[in-house]
Amino acid sequence: MKRGLILLDLDFVAGWSRELKAMNEGKEGGRYRYPESFIKLLAVVHAYVLPYRQLEGFMRGLSQYVDGLKAPDYTTIWWRVARMKVDVASSVEMDKDVTIAVDSSGIKVTNRGEWIHKKWRVQRGFIKVHIAVDTKTKQILAIEVTREDVGDGRMLRRLVNGSQSKAALGRVIADGAYDSKSNFRMLADMGIDPLIRVRKNASLKGGGCMPRKFAVVEQRGNLEWRRERGYGYRWMVESAFSCLKRVFGEYICAVKWPNIVKELLLKASIYNLFMKMNLN
C-alpha cells in the first residue's frame, strides 16, 4: 500500500541561489525571492486540497527541519502559483499512430454538501472538463475547461489539435455525443480514423459526409463492431476521470475562472506524472 506515501525531493534547496540568479537576470522591478521549482512544489501540495494559508504553515514547519528552506507567506504563494505556467503534457513522450479516447465530466464548484442544495435550493452548477487520453499510456494529452452548458461535440476539434501537438494521432474514439458530420469530416481531413458511435436512428444517406456514412453502415445491425474495431478502449478516458476524482476529489477550491482553469490543469499534470511513474 503506497497511497498517502510522501516522497519529497529537496534538490531545489541545493540550487536555490543558482536558480534565483538565473530568474532575476535582466528582470525589471522587484526581484524574485523564491525559485520556480519551489513554487511548483507548493502548487502540487495545494492541488491536494491544502488551502494556501495552511500551506504557509506547513512550509514554516518544514523550514525548521530543512536547512536553507525559506517559507513564503500566503500572498506570495497565491501570487506565484496563479501566474505559474502549467503544461499538462510536459511528461508525455512523443509517439506515432496514437489512439486517443475523448469524453467530458462535471466537477463541482463547491464542497459544501448536497444538504445545503436541498435545504436552500441553491444551485451553483458544475464546471465541465473535457479531456483526450492516450489509450496506451492513460496519460492526458489535451484538456479543456468550459461551462456546463457547452456541448461535448463542439470541443472535439480543440482536443484533437491539442493532442496533435504532443503525438501523431491515428484514431479517435468517442461516444455518441461527438456524432456529427462536421466532426467526422474534420477527422477524415486530418487523416485520423474516426471511431465514433453513431445514433441508432442514423440515416444511411451520406448527406455529403462519406466517413459518417461508412460508420453508419458498419455499426447498423453489427453487434460485433465494438470488439472488432476496439471501441471498448474508450473506457480509458472514464478510468482517467475516476482516478482524478478519487485522488483530488470531485470539487475545486478556486473561485475565479482563471484560477479554476489553473487548478484543473495542475491536477491533470500531476495525474500524468503518476501515469508516467507507473509506466516506468
Regions found by a protein language model. Name each.
Residues 1-29:
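Basic, low-complexity segments
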Residues 14, 145, 208-211:
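Soluble, non-transmembrane catalytic domains of enzymes that act on hydrophobic metabolites at membranes
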Residues 24-50, 57, 70-193, 199-200, ...:
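Polybasic low-complexity intrinsically disordered regions
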Residues 44-47, 222-280:
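Basic, amphipathic alpha-helical segments enriched in Lys/Arg and hydrophobic/aromatic residues
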Residues 51-58, 211-217:
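Short, compositionally biased low-complexity segments
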Residues 66-68, 273:
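Short arginine-rich
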Residues 176-246:
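Helix-centered, glycine/charged polyanion-binding patches within enzymatic domains
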